[in-house]
Amino acid sequence: FADHSLEANLRAIGKEFKKAREIAPEGVIGFNIMVATKNYAMYVKEAIKAGADIIISGAGLPVSLPAYLAEAAAEMKSAGLGETVKTKIAPIVSSVKSAMVILKMWDRKFGRVPDLVVIEGPLAGGHLGFSRESLTELGVDTPDVEHTYHQDAYDEEIRGIIRLVGEYAEKYQTKIPVVTAGGIYSHEDVMHQIDLGADGVQVATRFVTTVECDAPEEFKQAYIRSSKEDIVITKSPVGMPGRAIHNAFLSGVGQTPFKLEHCYQCLEKCDKKTIPYCITKALVNSAEGHTEDGLVFCGSNAFRAERIETVDEVMKSLLGE
């Protein structure tokens, strides 16, 4: 990976898809691919060729995603790999404005709409589709988010996105499911989203601290050890704010000038002279269990994890069973 990142990532797409399909023969298997990634189009097309059921894409606006789907379909057809492609495509949006850009562009340029829309809110983990100022206005950049979050304001944004998606669904005489994400931890959270009009929810943080999660034990324990004061908003080289667990790594960011020793060619836009750290190196370190030397992304409720659970336990909790 270090020396041949692109080739390694392309191989990993097929490898991980095969592994997931063996675990869930009848399951829906998707890839989350960041628009900000270098070689984005190649990764999208490789996932389609691998057999992905859905591609979810954010960290930027996936305005050209339908084009890459069409290109992959044409390449597969010419190679004798089938006449049709089953892969669905879904943009991640965080505001009515970003949803409008995607829907209008896909409608005008490609004559289609998304198969699914994911609304990722300000309580999500990892990269956030909000400016730092917007996060402050929403009251989600404090340790006491449960009391400072202006939920009513963002709930109205969600309703607005759902209304907008509905207009395009009506135009195309189809159903476009809307899934909400970010800070969903309990059955009550799930039901609140359904009451807002969501067709489903996307949950990540709760599944990190499960037996089945393939993250290293030290990564899971970082969640369990964390307090709400440890969960902070940090600036990412991707150019977006991100939510993570404060640790020795983040304490050291900006303390001394950063010198890039090896470039993984991971981001389309990366100013190697000014970045505070290498995001790939930081994420790889934490994924390998070196959590004090890496970036540990998490949702706003990560501190609520008290023990390692099973996926079955988490699902029953979310469903209120």
What are these regions (language model features)?
Residues F1-K171:
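Active-site entrance/lid segments in N-terminal catalytic domains of soluble metabolic enzymes
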Residues A124-V179, Y185-E321:
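Conserved active-site-proximal phosphate/metal-binding subdomains
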